């Protein structure tokens, strides 16, 4: 219950960064869902949203918040999403909810990326959480072998197909000291669609909600 309260506080703290007339990029996951609830309170002030997943899109529609296809949007001022982990550099691990590729696309399109998390997600070294990788199905074994070669322990996320029609590997036992290098290295493996390491497109602002209040890293 305390964790959910902290997620909600972080989500509502992001509202002050929204400007009238904005089209807002919206992420996926439990913290992003709290942000969608908060966005509903100012839906008449914004132009609409771009969503990273079907689940988020459904919630936005339920609140009668307009949705746009990213290809229709010439300027996306802001993207708000949670993370599985985030460090002081605002590099993140994302993808527990299987929407990492679309999240990375929208984050890259946005002028400003705000990450909203509770304090349990703030770490000094990334890698405690599994690192998700979206993979073309025929390349799953090849990619797994390449990940083992760099010291990771990949596990196939059975029964999950991404909205892009691909599969997921969750990589355990990685201590990520150079996230920029590792993101590039994994992305260069044939068959990898996207890795849930957000270092080259780090957050611009991190909103971290803890027992002592809100901490902002910008």
Curated annotation (Swiss-Prot):
Which keywords does the record carry? Isomerase
The protein's matches in Gene3D superfamilies, at most eight in alphabetical order, are given as: 3.30.70.260, 3.40.50.1360
Q: What class of enzyme is it?
A: isomerase
Pathway per its UniProt entry is: Carbohydrate degradation; pentose phosphate pathway; D-ribose 5-phosphate from D-ribulose 5-phosphate (non-oxidative stage): step 1/1
Which SUPFAM superfamilies does the protein's record reference?
A: D-ribose-5-phosphate isomerase (RpiA), lid domain (SSF75445), NagB/RpiA/CoA transferase-like (SSF100950)
The record's active-site residues are: 103 (proton acceptor)
Q: Which Pfam families match?
A: Rib_5-P_isom_A (PF06026)
Query: Which example biological process does GO assign this protein?
Result: pentose-phosphate shunt, non-oxidative branch
Top-level taxon in the UniProt lineage: Bacteria
Tell me which InterPro entries the record gives: NagB/RpiA_transferase-like, Ribose5P_isomerase_typA_subgr, Ribose5P_isomerase_type_A
The Gene Ontology CC terms held by the record are: cytosol
Chain positions recorded as substrate binding sites: 28-31, 81-84, 94-97, 121
Where would you find the membrane-spanning parts of this chain? none
Q: What does this protein do?
A: Catalyzes the reversible conversion of ribose-5-phosphate to ribulose 5-phosphate.
Instruction: Report the sequence similarity comment from the record.
Output: Belongs to the ribose 5-phosphate isomerase family.
- Spell out the subunit comment: Homodimer.
UniProt protein name: Ribose-5-phosphate isomerase A
- Write down the species: Wigglesworthia glossinidia brevipalpis
**Lineage, broadest ranks:** Bacteria, Pseudomonadati, Pseudomonadota, Gammaproteobacteria, Enterobacterales
Q: Which gene encodes it?
A: rpiA
């Amino acid at each position: 219950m305390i964790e959910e309260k902290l997620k909600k506080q972080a989500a509502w703290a992001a509202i002050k960064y929204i400007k009238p007339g904005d089209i807002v990029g919206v992420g996926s996951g439990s913290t992003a869902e709290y942000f969608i609830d908060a966005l509903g309170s100012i839906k008449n002030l914004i132009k609409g949203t771009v969503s990273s997943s079907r689940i988020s899109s459904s919630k936005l529609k339920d609140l009668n918040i307009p949705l746009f296809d990213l290809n229709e949007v010439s300027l996306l001022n802001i993207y708000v999403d949670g993370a599985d982990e985030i460090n002081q550099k605002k590099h993140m691990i994302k993808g527990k909810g299987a929407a990492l590729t679309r999240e990375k696309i929208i984050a890259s399109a946005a002028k400003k990326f705000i990450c909203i998390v509770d304090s349990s997600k703030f770490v000094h070294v990334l890698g405690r959480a599994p690192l998700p990788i979206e993979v073309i199905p025929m390349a799953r074994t090849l990619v797994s072998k390449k990940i083992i070669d760099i010291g990771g322990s990949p596990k196939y996320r059975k029964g999950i197909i991404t909205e892009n029609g691909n599969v997921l590997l969750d990589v355990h036992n990685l201590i990520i000291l150079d996230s920029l290098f590792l993101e590039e290295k994994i992305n260069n493996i044939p068959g990898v669609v996207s890795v849930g390491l957000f270092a080259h497109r780090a957050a611009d602002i991190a909103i971290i909600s803890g027992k002592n209040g809100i901490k902002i890293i910008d």
